[in-house]
């Protein structure tokens, strides 16, 4: 079946004829922002099984990069993929990585596994201060050397532990450092770390793989890595909290009877708080939110 997202990608514009209440149940998709670092993290293991994976272009592109490096992946269900990187090779990432900003997430695990990574600058950003500076500066702190040009090249004969204070609270930089640190058999501390749900999800995945991580969900992470490969693991991609929030607001503003299933309440505190402040008529069960028409105006 074709997803809503793939249909939208084929359109030049989207026209919505609204003004009507909705009725029914909608299931929240897996989070793209959580899935992409997990795919990059599969490089640290021989085999990884991911469930609740959104079938969207960025995910497919990320998997294709794994394949180009000598790994294998197979969709074993509609939203379930098994990734095997036992025979992964140390070679430059393909040119297609330039078109995917999330490809920067391969830098950390490739450097941890092979001591070297070469890849196109994501987005082709070569001029001025780059969004990846927080990544590369952190890698240098942990013992990597960098050579620049038309492609980004990092190498390290011996990676070290240490404390990193992020120049900005960058989600992708936090994830990249976590991935690199997981392959270093020393202590790494990250200060001013991002704490978004997908960062926490990556940490939980890596703890399943045998990595010691403390401070998950806070601005200070302490990581003790291990010799690679890490333990094989199965991990469910968390539901997309942004999508759940959007559906909740949609149900409220259209005064609908709408059930939003497959939600993760751990990451929805702020959304539920705002719904309460707006006097939205809703109820929460084990993994769903039910939005009902208001008994009085908002």
Residue ranges and their predicted role:
Residues 1-298:
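Short, structured segments at the rim of ligand-binding sites
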């Amino acid at each position: 079946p074709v997803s809503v997202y793939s249909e939208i990608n084929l359109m030049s514009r989207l026209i919505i004829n609204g003004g009507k209440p909705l009725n029914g149940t909608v299931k929240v998709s897996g989070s793209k922002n959580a899935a992409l670092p997990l795919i990059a993290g599969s490089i640290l293991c021989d085999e990884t099984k991911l469930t609740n994976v959104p079938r969207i272009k960025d995910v497919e592109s990320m998997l294709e990069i794994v394949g180009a490096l000598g790994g294998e992946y197979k969709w074993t269900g509609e939203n379930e993929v098994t990734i095997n990187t036992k025979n992964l090779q140390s070679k430059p990432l393909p040119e297609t990585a330039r078109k995917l900003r999330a490809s920067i997430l391969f830098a950390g695990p490739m450097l941890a596994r092979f001591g070297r990574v070469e890849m196109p600058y994501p987005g082709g950003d070569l001029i001025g201060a780059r969004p990846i500076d927080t990544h590369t500066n952190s890698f240098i702190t942990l013992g990597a050397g960098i050579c620049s040009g038309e492609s980004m090249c990092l190498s390290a004969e011996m990676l070290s532990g240490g404390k990193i204070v992020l120049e900005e609270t960058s989600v992708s930089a936090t994830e990249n450092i976590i991935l690199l640190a997981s392959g270093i058999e020393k202590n790494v501390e990250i200060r001013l770390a991002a704490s978004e749900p997908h960062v926490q999800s990556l940490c939980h995945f890596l703890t399943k793989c045998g990595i010691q991580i403390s401070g998950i969900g806070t601005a200070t992470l302490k990581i003790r890595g291990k010799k690679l490969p890490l333990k094989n693991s199965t991990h469910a991609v968390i539901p997309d909290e942004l999508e759940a929030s959007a559906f909740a607001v949609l149900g409220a503003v259209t005064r609908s009877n709408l059930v939003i299933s497959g939600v993760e309440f751990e990451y929805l505190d702020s959304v539920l708080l705002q719904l309460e402040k707006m006097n939205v008529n809703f109820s929460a069960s084990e993994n769903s939110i039910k939005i009902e028409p208001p008994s009085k105006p908002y």
